Each structure stands twice: as C-alpha cells, then as structure tokens.
Amino acid sequence: MKWLLLLGLLALSECIIHKVPLVRKKSLRKNLIEKGLLKDYLKTHTPNLATKYLPKAAFDSVPTETLENYLDTEYFGTIGIGTPAQDFTVIFDTGSSNLWVPSVYCSSAACSVHNQFNPEDSSTFQATSESLSITYGTGSMTGFLGYDTVKVGNIEDTNQIFGLSESEPGSFLYYAPFDGILGLAYPSISSSDATPVFDNMWNEGLVSEDLFSVYLSSDDESGSVVMFGGIDSSYYTGSLNWVPVSYEGYWQITLDSITMDGETIACADSCQAIVDTGTSLLAGPTSAISNIQSYIGASENSDGEMIVSCSSMYSLPNIVFTINGVQYPVPASAYILEEDDACISGFEGMNLDTYTGELWILGDVFIRQYFTVFDRANNQLGLAAAA
C-alpha cells in the first residue's frame, strides 16, 4: 500500500503544471490617450508590426528588437530576478525570445518610474561583456547581458541569461504599464543567441513536459494565466486540434483561408500566420485589412484609431480562420474592442511577405477565443475554444 501511495505521489509530481497569473491592465496606448500624448507619440514613433518579424539578418551587427509594437498589449505577469528576488512586471511574449528588464544603471526618465534590477543586491548575479540594443522609433534602448536566477511562478530558473537596460531614450516608455519582456518564441530568433527562459527551464528539468499553454480571459482584470509544463483542460471546451509549426522561429503556422459571410476575403491560396501573445490585435497585409475595415464600417478618428459604430457590433459577421482544415470563427464582439464610449476595430495593417506569401498575426483578439498550447516537443500548436 505504501508503494502504491508513493507511486501515486510520484506520478502527481511529474504532472505538476506551473501557473503564472496574468493581470489585464490599461495598455500603453490608453495611457498615452489619457495624457493627451498619443498624437505626438505617433508622429515620431510610427508603429510597424512588420519589423518585429523581420529575420535577424535584416538588422545590424548589434541585436535589435522593436518596442512600439507593444502599444496595445494589456496582459502582464510578475517574475522575480536575483537572490533575493527583485520583482518585475513583464509581457509574456510568444513573438520574441529574449528576457530584458530595466537596470539601476539606467538614468532615463522611463527607468525612474519602473522597477530596476540592481546586480549588487543579488548574490547570484554574473555579468557578461555582451551588449544588447533594442530599437524603438527614433532611439534605442541599450544595455548588457547577465546571468541570474529567474523565478517564474514557483519555478526557479537558475543561470538564466537576460538583458539589463542602461539607456531608454524617448518619453513613451515612461507611461508603459510593464517593466520588461519575457520572450517565449524559439531560440533561433533570440538576440545574441541568448537561451530563452522556457528553453532553460526544460534543459534544467524544471518542467515535466516540453510545452506551455496560455489562457487569456475576456474579464477586465483577472483570470488569465500562462501555464508551464502542462495543459489544464478546465480552461477549454471540446478537444484540442493540433497544428504543425511551419517555421521554428516564431510560433508560425499555415492558414488555409480567411473568410467573412462565407466569402474568402484574404489568404485565398493559404498563407502564413504567427500566434503572438505580445500583439494585441489581428494583423495582416495592409490592402486586406483596409478592405476589412471598409466592410465593417470602420473610420479613422483624431487619435489615429479605427472606430466602428457600437450599435452595429452585433450585426457584423464573424471572421473565420480555417487552420489545418478546422474553422476558428472570431465574432465581432471579439474583434471590436469597447473602450469607454468608443468601439475600436481590432484589425491592424502591416506588410511583410514570407517566402510562401502574405503573413498574418493572430494576437490577443484571437487567443481570447482559443486556449492555445505551445508544444515545443512536437513543434505544434494546440487550439480549443476557451472556456
């Protein structure tokens, strides 16, 4: 009997899912609107989603990563770095691979209002001589790389490489609701070839399965979670449908088609899409998005946002993404975002062709509808209707 109990406890320990709660906060865009600064920001920082997905070879010798693409991100979690742990609010971003946070060596105004890592307060920190540069708009964040223990939920990820900022020019990061970014994409797109956090977790035997999953709640504040090392079926209904990853860099898959009202509106001969928790909206080729905006009656307001009549929301059709033969409808109530007294279109245009054609980004608007499993062991995504 004792042996059976021990075997049961062992099996339970091997199936532990490490959950990190995510909190939904006001996005950087909302903060800028409230401060009356969005127009000025957009004049000098033109958001260009395509730059986030350019190959590493397209950049200079110093690794770069764009920041203005996090303008609409709303979901954030807390991690600890160092011994004892210093806490940071980060974006868990499946569209990038590096971890970085502000440091005490940064004298920029943006750093002064965010948590800053102090290496001298950590007994486990190890410095390196490698530099890191993260571009945004007309300036760039510069810093260096170091190693330390990173606590994610109840996982202690030792000897993890991460970036520490020393300079954050420009004013817009001052209003950012996050301190840094924790990338969850493949190591092949990591700046400076730094080992991503999840890879280090797996290499150190800290998770029982080589996968993580994400549930984004539609609730205004709570309920969202990222889970490492397992799948919790209470977060979805029906069964998971598995989709092969087509490029092991981003979490990239093949779309069969995109339709509205039964008509193909884009991706007629299949196309590529990236499932990205670090992008809030649904993004695609500018011409296709322009047609969709016209179809749903969206028009640009003085802040540069595409506005839709709130009264028309429930009469508009679903947009349907067919993936690996399965249809994934996204209703208008999901792709139109209600903000105060306005209704904002959840579509954004960008132009970035892949070797197989046009590229789409399935951001939080999509992920709120579909619980997503990021399976590194089998290089596949699992999708099921969110509970």
From Swiss-Prot:
Residues 16-59 form a propeptide. Transmembrane segments: none annotated. Keywords: Aspartyl protease, Digestion, Disulfide bond, Hydrolase, Protease, Secreted, Signal, Zymogen. It is found in: Secreted. Its EC number is 3.4.23.1. GO terms for cellular component: extracellular region. The keyword Signal applies. SUPFAM superfamilies: Acid proteases (SSF50630). The active site is at residues 93, 276. One of its GO terms (molecular function) is aspartic-type endopeptidase activity. Its main location: secreted. Belongs to the peptidase A1 family. This is Pepsin-3. It comes from Oryctolagus cuniculus.
